[in-house]
Amino acid sequence: MNKQSWLLNLSLLKTHPAFRAVFLARFISIVSLGLLGVAVPVQIQIMTHSTWQVGLSVTLTGGAMFVGLMVGGVLADRYERKKVILLARGTCGIGFIGLCLNALLPEPSLLAIYLLGLWDGFFASLGVTALLAATPALVGRENLMQAGAITMLTVRLGSVISPMIGGLLLATGGVAWNYGLAAAGTFITLLPLLSLPALPPPPQPREHPLKSLLAGFRFLLASPLVGGIALLGGLLTMASAVRVLYPALADNWQMSAAQIGFLYAAIPLGAAIGALTSGKLAHSVRPGLLMLLSTLGAFLAIGLFGLMPMWILGVVCLALFGWLSAVSSLLQYTMLQTQTPEAMLGRINGLWTAQNVTGDAIGAALLGGLGAMMTPVASASASGFGLLIIGVLLLLVLVELRRFRQTPPQVTASDS
């Protein structure tokens, strides 16, 4: 059979027990983090009535994640990766307990929320980097595209479920329940991760960590193909920072606390559909052009989002953004793995993830600032259409990425 299915092949979960353990742990972790992601902005909005303060919390956490990714890349290449993953997860859980205790105080501390956001952002990113570095050893380099799509599906499905649960918890029990369940879920993820095999770092000459990072930066800047992919990823992540406007837009649409969860769930739902129907993406002849066009469509969806007269139509726009961004992100991931030398894969993956975090932090800060000067509707639309203009310029400038062609892999009877 030579016809490739549109649907994602989930066979890796059956054939690779270690990857199955990571799948389970990641799903539980994403559900836990989703509860946190709903609670923090809503709590800050209630305490301060300021979109700028909400944006600041996201920016601070994003900055801590950037530093953590840089440090984590070095640790993952020097120390046993399973230990790094377990240490990072356990430390994050401690931070979530701190948020829960703070929320139970008669007057919760805004400073404590910011500081614990820095703590959790830093240590969470250590685990992310170690998992990225360990994935080829867990599934094999030939299965990276499939593993990436399954991972995205895991993340997105968890992100669909958790905001809805988080919204219901906010409406019934308050933010302390969100933080407490997030902490419990994070510690539960340690159980499947304990079953992972030892994941030693690859043998390589010892060099100063900064020198190693600089080599990765130089490669990224010198390669118009890989550098263009990283730039698109950062801009796409900037667009997703529109979530800092959700609480204010919810007031504009007169949404209930439970309905706010649908805003947070829309993008992950669209992305889950994109990952589930990604079976043919690896066989695209012109992945660079498809990546550029899907990114432009995602920016347009964000521009239209804030203009919708009803919140349900806004949810549809967010879901469309999620689907298009999933297509672009999967193509980014696959092309980075195939176009980056093996010796550079760890650093480039870390830098790619770090610039995505940076894009999110910058986007959150810009949207928070716009929200202080403009209406939430105008802020959302300005960000989407502004990124669309930049995207059109990149479509013209990134010639090598736009014209890149690949030979689709052959599909044999054993693959079907």
UniProtKB/Swiss-Prot annotation:
Its main location: membrane. Residues 1-21, 77-83, 131-156, 200-218, 278-287, 337-356, 400-416 are cytoplasmic. It is found in: Cell inner membrane. It comes from the Bacteria. The keyword Transmembrane helix applies. GO terms for cellular component: plasma membrane. Gene3D superfamilies: MFS general substrate transporter like domains. Residues 43-55, 105-109, 178, 240-256, 308-313, 378 are periplasmic. The chain crosses the membrane at residues 22-42, 56-76, 84-104, 110-130, 157-177, 179-199, 219-239, 257-277, 288-307, 314-336, 357-377, 379-399. It is a multi-pass membrane protein. GO terms for molecular function: enterobactin transmembrane transporter activity. Keywords: Cell inner membrane, Cell membrane, Membrane, Transmembrane, Transmembrane helix, Transport. Component of an export pathway for enterobactin. NCBIfam families: PRK10489.1. Belongs to the major facilitator superfamily. EntS (TC 2.A.1.38) family. This is Enterobactin exporter EntS. It comes from Escherichia coli O127:H6 (strain E2348/69 / EPEC). The gene is entS.
